[in-house]
């Protein structure tokens, strides 16, 4: 693989060569401008209003300038692509430290969602919350939040997330990633007041629905921003950091809830304090995001090339000519990728995600990939405290188990970073599902026994499930859903995929509530059989349909999908996404300077088209 320094040196040599050519010969554009001036004296229009159109680049006497320029830009893009693919991790960190830092900052917004969704499930096991909002179970003598309200509260925040995700698409199109995130943080800070001053489950439902809207925004933009602002060598780490933020949020929630159980067991602060702590995040995050660079991919799609260049400069370390050349080559690569996608369709709408076979396949894979987080039984982990209580452990022990579980999840995500150097995306996804299935079947078997040891064993194995989930499918999904879509449709595809997840999550939540609640199905640990089966079904889909994207740049992934390469052959298939563009450049019919030159003429407020004969 060609090194980054040699790549920059070749670029310098080409620039020096062009300067020599300009000094030793007459520039073709200058020659033609003289000719145009002579023609203007004989014509009726004012040459001061003449504008060149997109195709009006004039070749030199050898008829080589246009192909050379196109081929050079394509070569720069290809070399930048090769450099990105072969860049070691430490080189990437030294070259893009600012990009990594900005990505970490933006992804930290997900801590809030992981925190709030975790405390909601933990409230169902908190005695003061149960007595305040629950009803007495005549069979057990304990207070419980009814299944209907548990389902309703879950549906409310998921409905809010669906609405928020759909609003994110047009908002990003209009104002970009940064200002959309800042606006979402502002609204979240306002909506938390409803939760803090709640007087009934109805108020909590309204607060959850409204808070779900900014959470939906965070779900989409953290992943897309990380994938677009960082190079391939950092992409897995910074997209899967989203999962780490979820785990941190859940761990914070478990620690806060254990504190509430110990210190505020009979006080409203037991649930008000966890709500109030959410105000810690919005202001500092909004200030940080305000100073973050906008995604250069979004800026190029909007035609703001100069701003995209400045954004790239802010993500790279170093200074001087070498940095400028690296920025130029990276910009060429982004423009080439987007131009190739735009040739397939001029617009980037939700309909484009499904209207043709290529994008329909990519959207399907992204949706089913994220749905896998539901169908693998991971939602049972979110209700772990409630599950542990139903398994027969004390409330205090249940909260302790939850803390251990989330710590294991964080450790597993870090291990997945190490494993990603040796395993592909598909490998982590598939092996994680296989191990989860085994653990769930064992949990189901233990659920058939009423002994204390069996109950404790099922609770301990749920921690093992959480470990394998956060080692495999949980983090890798965040990377896959950012790599599978085209750059032009990335935000919209992620929105559709996450909303597919949210819709299925509604069904999964209802099932879990019925499986665990003593007044309904009361399956308890036996629900492991159910989720073990769904893990195997999800694994079967992955084997057939989920491609391996590890080590592939965005433009390579585009080409693999364009060629219709089967999922299991993605890893071994070699492609040259620049070959077609090179061929097109070589076939350009360059006109002789003596032939007609078509230009666009703007004459005194009206547009006309003229052919100037030289």
UniProtKB/Swiss-Prot annotation:
It is found in: Membrane. This is Maltose permease MAL31. The lineage of its organism: Eukaryota, Fungi, Dikarya, Ascomycota, Saccharomycotina. Its main location: membrane. PANTHER family: ALPHA-GLUCOSIDES PERMEASE MPH2-RELATED (PTHR48022:SF5), PLASTIDIC GLUCOSE TRANSPORTER 4 (PTHR48022). Residues 38-48 have a biased composition (Basic and acidic residues). It comes from Saccharomyces cerevisiae (strain ATCC 204508 / S288c). PROSITE patterns: MFS, SUGAR_TRANSPORT_2. Residues 1-48, 595-614 are annotated as: Disordered. Induction: By maltose and maltotriose. Repressed by glucose. It comes from the Eukaryota. NCBIfam families: SP. It is a multi-pass membrane protein. The chain crosses the membrane at residues 109-129, 145-165, 181-201, 203-223, 237-257, 273-293, 365-385, 399-419, 428-448, 461-481, 494-514, 527-547. Residues 130-144, 202, 258-272, 386-398, 449-460, 515-526 are extracellular. One of its GO terms (molecular function) is carbohydrate:proton symporter activity.
